[in-house]
């Protein structure tokens, strides 16, 4: 007899894997769609030009297309290009691995600052006083300090006249055209949907592909009726707004937020490598090799620090919520329980996952803040090493109350042979019962990245994506449950929507998220394609009398 469930799963996986392989703009259908696209005409950008704040950091640093076009503009003026080139050399030096070569680069940078490009004329972006200091520098400590000063002067130079000239240049006009293109309405017709990857309390997560770029994403589909029936609107909007605010290589990115007739949809980074819980318990022996534990812990720490810097407490850090991408880098996911700290006030609502919640959450009167995430970090590191959580053995049956009492009263024990002294120490510090004694929150400058557990990690290089992961997922494997193992939801009946609901849906469905969308446009080659002046006739910029955005869906 034919196993129809197995056949359905095979078909779903095959289509999904094929889509992943062809997401690089090589399909004929994708090329056909792209030929129908064009940027809006310049006249359609005038309203946006008046409304767009002249914010250098946003326009020229944070937004990928703005950053790209600003650098293209700088390349047209030698003095501006020189300043930009110097900043790029400084960044290369900052990210270089320690050693003699880095010291030589430092000396070369200071020598560049000390020698004027033309006899008797200092660099246009450096003050004469700084040039003189560079000429007199004799120690590496002096040189490093002078390079920092030169970096600040070069950046201040670019933010002045070059930025003002950029704002009245054709390069900025092109940026505005891309911004109008970015603001087009988004619906479910924008995507091709593939297999379901999992289910949650309010809906499902499935793989989707953007029809016009080929980019693959994960789409979290929240059932509108289920949200209303369970009063989940506030949580859904909170997750969306927090994801929108975060731009970190260590936290999943939100690319689109839209609504269909039946769902609110969050389109996020597709992490093909599975979650850390799967790798801890379902691949080989329980637990992970120490080099993987250190690498993932370092990236998780960076992710938590990024959230905290934005005033966000994660509240649900655990291996199940840490996902691997194609290359083996990890990101924090599922920010449904994340909360924004308001005016420094502690959180009093109990939330989290049993076994990972800090003692202060479990108290009779909960009152807590950022330190709860460091406690969960300790639980997660322990679990990656030992293949069990600190206060409950693998597959042990225990009540929530007993687990709570263990968390509140018992000291952590390290019986697994894989624990190194550094691993034991960082777990003890993260698992301190009181927030004031916990690593990451003992004082304002308490940085977990400085712990000797991370002595092999170069954090600036890690944040720049220059450290190779110790494990790369198999691209031919689908790290998700079989489709027939994922339960279907029963239909929600008797729920009707009123005007207030419709207003909420519109507030949620804001379309493309600028940074993630612009990264997609550049990464998939659409930026170069639509900017190509030699593009065939009929595939150029839009007619100025129309919106100019032509989409074939």
Swiss-Prot record:
Q: Does the keyword Protease apply?
A: no
**InterPro entries the UniProt entry points to:** AGC-kinase_C, GPCR_kinase, Kinase-like_dom_sf, Prot_kinase_dom, Protein_kinase_ATP_BS, RGS, RGS_sf, RGS_subdomain_2
Lipid-linked residues (S-geranylgeranyl cysteine)? 550
Topology versus the membrane, per the UniProt entry? Lipid-anchor
Any idea which residues are catalytic in this one? Answer: 316 (proton acceptor)
- Residues recorded as bearing Phosphoserine in the entry: 36
GO CC, any one term: cytoplasm
Q: Where is the Protein kinase domain?
A: 191-454
Q: Which family does it belong to?
A: Belongs to the protein kinase superfamily. AGC Ser/Thr protein kinase family. GPRK subfamily.
Q: Which residues form the propeptide?
A: 551-553
Regulation of activity: Inhibited by phosphorylation of Ser-36.
The record's listing under SMART domains reads: RGS, S_TKc
Q: Which SUPFAM superfamilies match?
A: Protein kinase-like (PK-like) (SSF56112), Regulator of G-protein signaling, RGS (SSF48097)
Catalytic activity, EC: 2.7.11.14
Intracellular or extracellular location(s)? Membrane
Q: What is this protein called?
A: Rhodopsin kinase GRK7
């Amino acid at each position: 007899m034919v196993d129809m469930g197995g056949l359905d799963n095979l078909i779903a996986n095959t289509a999904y894997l094929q889509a992943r392989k062809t997401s690089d703009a090589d399909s004929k259908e994708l090329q056909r769609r792209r030929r129908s696209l064009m940027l809006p005409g310049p006249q359609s950008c005038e309203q946006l030009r008046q409304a767009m704040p002249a914010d250098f950091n946003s326009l020229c640093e944070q937004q990928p297309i703005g950053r790209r076009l600003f650098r293209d503009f700088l390349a047209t003026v030698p003095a501006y290009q020189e300043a930009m080139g110097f900043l790029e050399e400084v960044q290369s030096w900052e990210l270089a691995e320690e050693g003699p070569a880095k010291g030589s680069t430092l000396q070369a940078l200071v020598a560049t600052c000390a020698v004027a490009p033309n006899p008797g004329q200092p660099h246009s972006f450096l003050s004469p006083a700084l040039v003189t200091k560079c000429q007199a520098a004799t120690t590496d400590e002096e040189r490093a300090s002078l390079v920092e000063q030169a970096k600040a002067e070069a950046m201040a130079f670019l933010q002045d006249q070059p930025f003002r000239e950029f704002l009245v240049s054709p390069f900025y006009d092109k940026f505005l055209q891309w911004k109008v293109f970015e603001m087009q309405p988004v619906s479910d017709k924008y995507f091709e949907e593939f297999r379901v990857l999992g289910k949650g309390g309010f809906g499902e997560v499935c793989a989707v592909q953007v029809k016009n770029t080929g980019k693959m994403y994960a789409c979290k589909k929240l059932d509108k009726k289920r949200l209303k029936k369970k009063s989940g609107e506030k949580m859904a909007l909170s997750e969306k707004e927090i994801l929108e605010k975060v731009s970190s290589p260590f936290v999943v990115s939100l690319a689109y937020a839209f609504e269909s007739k039946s769902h609110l949809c969050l389109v996020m980074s597709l992490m093909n490598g599975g979650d850390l819980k799967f790798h801890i318990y379902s691949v080989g022996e329980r637990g992970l090799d120490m080099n993987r534990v250190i690498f993932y812990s370092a990236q998780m720490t960076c992710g938590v620090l990024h959230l905290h810097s934005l005033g966000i407490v994660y509240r649900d850090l655990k291996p199940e919520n840490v996902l691997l991408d194609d290359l083996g880098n990890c990101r924090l996911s599922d920010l449904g329980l994340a909360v924004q700290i308001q005016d420094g006030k502690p959180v009093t609502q109990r939330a989290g996952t049993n076994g990972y919640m800090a003692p202060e959450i479990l108290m009779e009167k909960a009152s807590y803040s950022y330190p709860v995430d460091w406690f969960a970090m300790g639980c997660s590191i322990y679990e990656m090493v030992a293949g069990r959580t600190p206060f409950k053995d693998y597959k042990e049956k225990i009540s929530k109350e007993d687990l709570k009492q263990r968390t509140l009263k018992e000291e952590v024990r390290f019986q697994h042979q894989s624990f190194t002294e550094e691993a034991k120490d960082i777990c003890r510090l993260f698992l301190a019962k009181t927030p004031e004694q916990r690593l990451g929150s003992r004082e304002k400058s308490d940085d977990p990245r400085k712990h000797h557990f991370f002595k092999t990690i170069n954090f600036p290089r890690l944040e720049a994506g220059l450290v190779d992961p110790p494990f790369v997922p198999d691209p031919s494997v689908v790290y998700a449950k079989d489709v027939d193992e994922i339960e279907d939801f029963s239909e929600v009946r008797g729920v009707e929507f009123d005007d207030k609901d419709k207003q909420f849906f519109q507030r949620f469905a804001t379309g493309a998220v600028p940074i993630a969308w612009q990264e997609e446009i550049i990464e998939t080659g659409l930026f170069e394609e639509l900017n190509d002046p030699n593009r065939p006739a009929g595939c150029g910029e839009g007619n100025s009398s129309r919106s100019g955005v032509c989409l074939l869906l």
